[in-house]
Amino acid sequence: MPAKTRNVLIACSDYYGPFYKDGENTGAFFLELLHPYLVFRDACFNVDIVTESGKIQFDDHSVAGPAIDKGSKGEEFLSYDDHIASGPELSKAEKYVLENKDDMFWRIVQNSKTADEVNPDKYDIFFVAGGHATLFDFPKATNLQKLGTSIYENGGVVAAVCHGPTLLPFMKRQTSDGSVSIVCGKDVTAFDRVAEDKSKLMEALKKYNLEVLDDMLNDAGANFIKSPNPFGDFVIADGRLVTGSNPASATSTAKTALRVL
C-alpha cells in the first residue's frame, strides 16, 4: 500500500500597502514563506499557499534593503545591532530562489489558492506566515479563519510565526461555554512590543491603529511568553499549537510543527 500523501497549507496576508515611514509597503514576509516551504519540501510534504483572496505580494523590506544589502533602504530595520526585525541577510541559496522565478517555490506562489476554495480535510499542518500586513487583513479574513480552525479541529497542527499569530485569536472553536479562540489557555509567542519598539515601528502601528500582538493574544485568553532575545530564534509548542517569535524562528517553527505532528 502506498504511503499516505502528507500536505501542508501555508497561509499568508494578501494585504500590500503603506506601512513603513520610508514609503515602502508591507506585505507577506518572504523568508517566512520560503523557510517553512523548504522545511516541508525536504520532509516530502506537498505544499500549497493560501490567502483570503488568493493574491500575494511580498513586503518590500523582506525582498530588498537590509534583507539583501544592509543599509540600502529601510533604515528603521537597522536600529538594533545586526539582528533586525527582518532577520539575517539572505543567503546565496535564498537569493537564488528570490531571483529565479522558475523555482518551484514561485510556481506555488503563483498558484496560491483563495481560502474559500480549499478543502481543509486535505491538510495535516496549517502554517501561518507573518509580516506586518497580517495586522491589516487577518482580523477580517473570515474564510482564512474558518479554514485554519477546521484543520485544527480535524486533528491537524496549527503553526504561526512572527506576525502570523495575528490570525489565531480569530480562529474560534465551540465549547460548552460557547465560542473561544484556539489560543485560549495556551502558551504562545509572537513578535512582541519590545521587538516592535526596538525596530522603531511603534509609531507606524499607532498611525494605522494596529494592535501589538502581546495585547491581542493575551486578550484572547492566551499566556503570552516573550522571547528572551527579540530577534533570536524562539519557538513555543503547546499541544498542536506551535508559535515562533520572529522571522529568525520560521525554520524552527516549521520543524517543530513536523515533530508535533
Swiss-Prot record:
One of its GO terms (molecular function) is glyoxalase III activity. Keywords: Lyase, Stress response. GO terms for biological process: methylglyoxal catabolic process to D-lactate via S-lactoyl-glutathione. The active site is at C162, H163, E196. It holds the Pfam family DJ-1_PfpI. GO terms for cellular component: cytoplasm. It is an enzyme of class 4 (lyase). Its EC number is 4.2.1.130. It catalyses: methylglyoxal + H2O = (R)-lactate + H(+). Catalyzes the conversion of methylglyoxal (MG) to D-lactate in a single glutathione (GSH)-independent step. May play a role in detoxifying endogenously produced glyoxals. Involved in protection against reactive oxygen species (ROS). Belongs to the peptidase C56 family. HSP31-like subfamily. PANTHER family: GLUTATHIONE-INDEPENDENT GLYOXALASE HSP31-RELATED, PROTEIN/NUCLEIC ACID DEGLYCASE DJ-1-RELATED. This is Probable glutathione-independent glyoxalase hsp3103. It comes from Schizosaccharomyces pombe (strain 972 / ATCC 24843) (Fission yeast).
